[in-house]
Amino acid sequence: MAEVRDMLRGLGLRPELIGRAETLRRLPVLEGGERPAGALLHRDAIVHHDAVLHAYRAAARKLGVRLMEGIEALAVLANAGKVEGLRSGAGDILAPVVVNAAGGWSGAFSAKAGVRIPNTPLRREALVTEAAQPFMRAAITFYRPREGWFNQTLRGELVAGCLAPAEEPGVNLAATALSLGRTARTILAKAPRLGQLRVVRQWAGVYDMTPDRKPLVGPVARLQGFVQANGCNGRGFLLGPLIGELLARWLDSGERPPLLAGFDADRFDGREDAKVEAGDYYAGYAAGGQRG
């Protein structure tokens, strides 16, 4: 736990370390599982992605934003080193700025603009069980030797995932029996009581990974008007609102907010072939915390 504590403190967080007795008092579901101790983060929370997206959609429309859902972005229109717009499945859209916020597809989309970046999509899977009476309020994440997480929704389902350290990079949205078994075994080692729950759904998505585990945010030098907002390494839902706010301020004023100084969109120029390590997810954060 000291390693996790030091990593979190290096990131500016203030975790409360709790031992076996306090952990089991807060989370009886862990009774009988391995190593019931933890670091408590009081300010963390779980929110439902659909509800958040609905709220953002409604707010954007009130501001007059035109949303074109389900339309593929085919190419970036450019001339003389400047963006002129976007070619979409619904026709050309003229604009002096195009923001690449394509998540796991950001590397491929950036290439359409002639700007290579080392972003690499990496599959992650999750599962959800049938609903049960409330048995836990906190979300649980665990780190080394196995990494994963689980929490209970307001409707009573258990949602869980366990990372595969040897996952092959690339866009792959297929859910696998291998992941199902690995996740079930790992979660049951932590909370044996959950073995009575039945899995009802499983799915896969992709993380947008960068070699240094940091986002790419801001305009690029090679193509005026092309802006990166990607590479969130599986934390886009957390980072997206702040990145959006700071990036909008930057594009409006022409001045980069100090908080974005460490995420320069051109920092991999000349190193576009830098590799993403698919292993230990938190290793990049641990190293970053030690450096900071």
Question: Residues of each region from the PLM?
Answer:
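C-terminal catalytic lobe of FAD-dependent flavoproteins
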Residues: 188-292
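Helical element adjacent to the flavin cofactor pocket in flavoenzyme catalytic cores
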Residues: 39-97
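Mid-domain beta-loop-alpha active-site segment that forms a flexible
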Residues: 38-59, 103-105, 179-186, 232, ...
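Central helical "cap/lid" subdomain
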Residues: 88-137, 173
